[in-house]
């Protein structure tokens, strides 16, 4: 899949494309409807399937304090887009100047002159151009004989609008199961493993892979979760009994560790029944279900007792996840309860 940063990077010999436009944060099931329609049309007419996304998020340009937390990084968006069959992603730097482009110029410059589009797919709530004056209907009017426009209805399921906002709300409530339902996949974060306080293995007997994220990143509410940890592809050797690209069962703590008075929020993953030196390795942490809320305990002994129960519940939830997703045995490691 090709990735272009800015319109100037798009090859001049791109002669036909089917295009979908949006921020696509999370690449949730609603986004997938747009992407699938774009890929289907591209294959039908022998065109390239192109996704246009914006970075930074448009809201952050005009209302920085109200900018939504990011569900996916650009790199994660790219990987998800490719998995659905997108041939190329154009990343546009969203600026105030760009937002002042008239809808007509927007179509002429982006869709016709740059991407040579024959077809464009947008959601029913799509807006574009100066003061967001362009809508899905006006896009149809502007394009008319120039290219075809497919407007996709927003996705409602079980009375819930599937949107990035909905996903963020589920995460803020700690309801990762519902977030996963809206996403059509496990919510996950990726990043390097860094050194934490060191008490997990030495003091508690539960060594963890620690990750820290910027406060612009969407994370589940503070609590303990069942999930999977996967070491991302690497040429560096992994010391221990874990290997890259295998999902290992993990009990995941999100929060500040109130029992020990920590202040920095982190994601700490205790991998069940495996042990490896993961420092410096990039890992993917997938959240499957909520285990319990974050608590402050009166003693380390009380904490250890509850953590043992967390591990037991994690095994049960992940065994159910394996069955629900019919996971191939070679893709994961989950040891049965002894």
Curated annotation (Swiss-Prot):
GO molecular function, one term: ATP binding
pH dependence: With magnesium ions the highest turnover of riboflavin is observed between pH 6 and 7.5, while that of FAD is between 7.0 and 9.0. With zinc ions a steady increase in riboflavin turnover is observed between pH 4.5 and 10, while FAD is the major product at pH 7.0 and decreases rapidly above pH 8.0.
Keyword Membrane included in the entry's annotation: no
Summary of activators and inhibitors of this protein: Higher divalent cation concentrations lead to decrease in the turnover of riboflavin and the 5'-phosphotransferase activity, while the adenylyltransferase activity increases.
Keyword Electron transport: no
Pathways per UniProt: Cofactor biosynthesis; FAD biosynthesis; FAD from FMN: step 1/1; Cofactor biosynthesis; FMN biosynthesis; FMN from riboflavin (ATP route): step 1/1
Family from the record: Belongs to the RibF family.
Protein name (record): Bifunctional riboflavin kinase/FMN adenylyltransferase
Protein's organism: Corynebacterium ammoniagenes
Gene transcribed to yield this protein: ribF
């Amino acid at each position: 899949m090709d990735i272009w940063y800015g319109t100037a990077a798009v090859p001049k010999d791109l002669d036909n494309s089917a295009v979908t436009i949006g921020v696509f944060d999370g690449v949730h099931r609603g986004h997938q409807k747009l992407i699938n329609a774009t890929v289907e049309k591209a294959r039908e007419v022998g065109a390239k399937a192109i996704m246009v996304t914006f970075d930074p998020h448009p809201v952050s340009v005009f209302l920085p304090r109200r900018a939504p937390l990011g569900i996916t990084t650009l790199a994660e968006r790219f990987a998800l887009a490719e998995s659905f069959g997108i041939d190329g992603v154009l990343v546009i730097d969203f600026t105030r100047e760009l937002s002042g482009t008239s809808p007509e110029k927007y179509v002429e410059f982006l869709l016709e002159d740059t991407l040579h589009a024959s077809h464009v797919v947008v959601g029913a709530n799509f807006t574009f151009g100066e003061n967001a004056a362009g809508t899905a209907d006006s896009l149809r009017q502007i394009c008319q004989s120039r290219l075809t426009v497919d407007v996709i209805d927003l996705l409602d399921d079980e009375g819930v609008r599937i949107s990035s906002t909905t996903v963020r709300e589920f995460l803020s409530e700690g309801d990762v199961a519902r977030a996963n339902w809206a996403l059509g996949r496990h919510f996950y974060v990726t990043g390097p493993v860094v050194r934490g306080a060191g008490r997990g293995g030495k003091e508690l007997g539960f060594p963890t892979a620690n990750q820290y994220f910027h406060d612009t990143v969407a994370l589940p509410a503070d609590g303990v979760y069942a999930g999977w940890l996967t070491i991302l592809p690497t040429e560096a050797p992994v010391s221990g009994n874990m290997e890259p690209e295998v999902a290992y069962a993990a009990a995941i703590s999100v929060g500040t560790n109130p029992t020990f008075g920590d202040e920095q929020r982190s994601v700490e993953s205790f991998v069940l029944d495996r042990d490896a030196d993961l420092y410096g390795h990039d890992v993917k942490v997938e959240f499957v279900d909520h285990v319990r809320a974050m608590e402050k305990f009166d003693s380390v002994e009380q904490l250890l007792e509850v953590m043992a129960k967390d591990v037991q519940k994690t095994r049960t939830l992940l065994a159910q996840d394996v069955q629900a997703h019919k996971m191939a045995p070679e893709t994961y490691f989950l040891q049965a309860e002894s």
